């Protein structure tokens, strides 16, 4: 009898969850280190304030946050070797992929990315090969429902926003130009909106439409492989398929 099998499965599941959580903590710690180069005081450093907010939302312990700030600002070790690098490539069905990384070794990161692409039906490309298919913009998530839409529209007329999207979870995502993130989230707060998250994102200008389940699975497998790499900060793609296909492919 395999009476221990359930416990073994629980332990394996916990190990996977712990590993993923550790990877998230490491990734967010690196973001804090890079942001802290411009000053260790969050009140005068918007990028650091943003990184700390993301870390707290993910449950990163306060001690980890403090150590990352110290390293990045040169007070506790060397965090200055980390640099922000962008990589571009193609996936199955011509999907464009844009990856942001924080790394202390460009050669290692490029090799890891090249392997992940090649093992999953893609190719790491040259700088600029797909960036023109995306736009970099600000995004602020607020608490809002369909009942708040008229008020939200009035608010956005007074702010430097260029659109919004109401979501089914009781939130709305407000979009704006890349350079306006701080002013946009400050303005929404001042108008009484509860701001949940804010940051920059890459949005696809055109999409690759996927209708085949096998192709969708290949695309998602590549994106998951890239996102799982230690140095990767974000993975963006111009992939589009309907919700039913996404559920089948996941």
Swiss-Prot record:
Main location: cytoplasm
Keyword RNA-binding: no
Keyword Nucleus: no
Keywords: Cytoplasm, DNA-binding, Transcription, Transcription regulation
GO MF terms held by the record: DNA binding
Highest rank taxon of the organism: Bacteria
Biological-process GO terms, alphabetical: regulation of DNA-templated transcription
Subcellular location per the Swiss-Prot or TrEMBL entry: Cytoplasm
Entry's Gene Ontology cellular component terms: cytosol
Family designation: Belongs to the TACO1 family.
Name of the featured protein: Probable transcriptional regulatory protein SYNW0543
Originating species: Parasynechococcus marenigrum (strain WH8102)
């Amino acid at each position: 009898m395999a009476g221990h099998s359930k416990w073994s499965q629980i332990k394996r599941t916990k190990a996977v969850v712990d590993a993923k959580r550790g990877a998230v903590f490491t990734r967010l710690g690196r973001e804090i280190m890079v942001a802290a180069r411009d000053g260790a005081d969050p009140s005068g450093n918007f990028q650091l304030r943003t990184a700390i907010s993301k870390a707290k939302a993910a449950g990163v312990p306060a001690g980890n946050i403090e150590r990352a700030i110290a390293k990045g600002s040169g007070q506790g070790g060397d965090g200055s070797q980390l640099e922000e690098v962008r990589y571009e490539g193609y996936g199955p069905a011509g999907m464009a992929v844009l990856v942001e990384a924080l790394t202390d070794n460009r050669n290692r990161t490029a090799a890891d990315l090249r392997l992940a692409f090649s093992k999953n039906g893609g190719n790491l490309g040259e700088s600029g090969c797909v960036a023109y298919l995306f736009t970099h913009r600000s995004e602020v998530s607020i608490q809002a429902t369909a009942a708040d839409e008229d008020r939200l529209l009035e608010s956005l007329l007074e702010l430097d926003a260029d659109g919004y999207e109401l979501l089914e979870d009781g939130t709305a995502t407000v979009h704006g130009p890349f350079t306006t993130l701080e002013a946009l989230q400050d303005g929404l707060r001042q108008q009484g909106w509860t701001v949940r998250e804010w940051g920059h994102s890459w949005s696809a200008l055109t999409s690759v439409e996927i209708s085949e389940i096998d192709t969708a699975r290949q695309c998602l497998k590549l994106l998951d492989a890239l996102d799982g790499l230690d140095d990767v900060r974000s993975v963006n793609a111009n992939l589009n398929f309907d919700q039913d296909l996404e559920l089948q492919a996941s």
